[in-house]
Amino acid sequence: FVEVSEAMSLDCPPGSAEPWLPLIDASSDRESFDKRFPEKKPDDVINFLIRDRLNPNSIISCIQLARENARQIRDVLTTEMWEQINILYWNMQEGEAIWNKPRQEQLSEIRRACQLFYGITDATLSKDLAWRFSILGRLVERADKTSRILDVKYYLLLPSLDELGGVLDELQWIALLRSAGAYQMFRKAEQNSIKPESVARFLLLDPIFPRSIRYCLDGISNTLKMID
């Protein structure tokens, strides 16, 4: 989400929070944010989403909760999984080197660490009931994230109706695809120019892209059948 708004901010006046506020809307945290940050500065939005421990949906809060959940089921996890979630948790504490890096590098490092955890889980955890529940949770999370990414675009208002289908509109759709890790696979599936209906169809209905809502729902259904 943050990376989408990072790209969109280039087309807005310096200091404008307009490209960032859709992130707050999409995460349903607008009321809480407005009460605490009435001036709505871009840095306030970014810190609220990434490092704010009072925001239960911030990245750092989610990782803290994930580590606590992992601690409670420590006997189910492999040592490698526990080590990885701890590395991510401790690397995100105040004063750590990650916070001295540019914002894009911070986000990339966090994303890679999360992807590494998924890879370690698939490589080290026996494919038993615990693994199936982890897959179920992952698919639910992905479907929710993709729907929220589409919400971000809904809230990203264009300067005027004349911009619909224009350069700025296309840039927003490209940024949205990249935020879902879907740009390259979309271009392989759709040879024509980027159109809103094509992007929405791909992210909602593509049967083989692992982050499309259809793929996730099919996976959820199949996993529930295996659990049953």
Can you name each region flagged by the protein language model?
Residues F1-D228:
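Alpha-helical transmembrane segments and their helix-helix packing motifs
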